[in-house]
């Protein structure tokens, strides 16, 4: 069964980026090699600070969208609580 991930990386400027991936580690490497999102390309290096696992892509994408509506403070609280 495939796994789908929603993740948050902390960028070099302190900002947070939320994304979706099937392989989180490979995606973080892409971000750090400048091959990820435009947002992270100019804010490298990035550090993985949070991830959630889902069994379907649909669930993961819904959660990614939800997290992207959160304020920075809500994201930081979620990261802190693990």
From Swiss-Prot:
Please give the SUPFAM superfamilies that the UniProt record associates with this protein: GIY-YIG endonuclease
What Pfam family is a match for this entry? GIY-YIG
Cystine pairs annotated here are: none
Query: What SMART domains does the entry give?
Result: GIYc (SM00465)
Where is the GIY-YIG domain positioned along the sequence?
2-77
Q: Report the domain of life of the source organism.
A: Bacteria
- Which InterPro entries did the record assign? GIY-YIG_endonuc, GIY-YIG_endonuc_sf, UPF0213_domain
Please state which protein family the record places this protein in. Belongs to the UPF0213 family.
Q: What is this protein called?
A: UPF0213 protein SERP0126
Its source organism is: Staphylococcus epidermidis (strain ATCC 35984 / DSM 28319 / BCRC 17069 / CCUG 31568 / BM 3577 / RP62A)
